[in-house]
Amino acid sequence: MIKRLVILGAPGAGKGTQARRICELLDIPTFSTGAMLRAQMQEGTELGIKAKELINRGELVPDSIISSLVESELKSERFSRGFLADGYPRNLEQAHFMDSVLKDLDTQLDAVINLDVDLEDVVGRLLKRAEIEHRSDDTEPVIRRRLQVYHEQTEPLVRYYREAKLLINIDGNGSIYQVWDCIKSKLS
């Protein structure tokens, strides 16, 4: 049974929305580096302040910071029955690190869901979300920079997981419900 997953997709592809549904369906917790970082930023920790500066410029938080958060979370009891990783890994180094941590735990990923979306549609989605949620990291220049960073650093993960025969490619351009129906059919 599928219990350890990663969800990939450009910023604004709907990863968080679909992650919640997948977690409910499979009865597993979500593992979100974005949520962990937002909590650190809200608490005003040193890590949170540094992360906020980088995120507001549209850059990724360095692997060294993320990796220490990820390792302690993956080794916690909360994720021992499975998880859905949302926002991690974002590059090949992080994927190798995650594989290593899971190997230490005598387990591995079961599947990787990739939400494939039209990038211009994503810009529109994110600008709309920025208005609704008042997110400082969703200005148009920052969005375009995040998409560029995604393309350069994160897209190689699609190839990596395809070669590992873990990739489930999903057309993410439909409605929330159409995308969800596609995901459900692939997971069953």
Predicted regions and their residues:
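Glycine-rich phosphate-binding loop of ATP-dependent small-molecule kinases
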Residues: 1-188
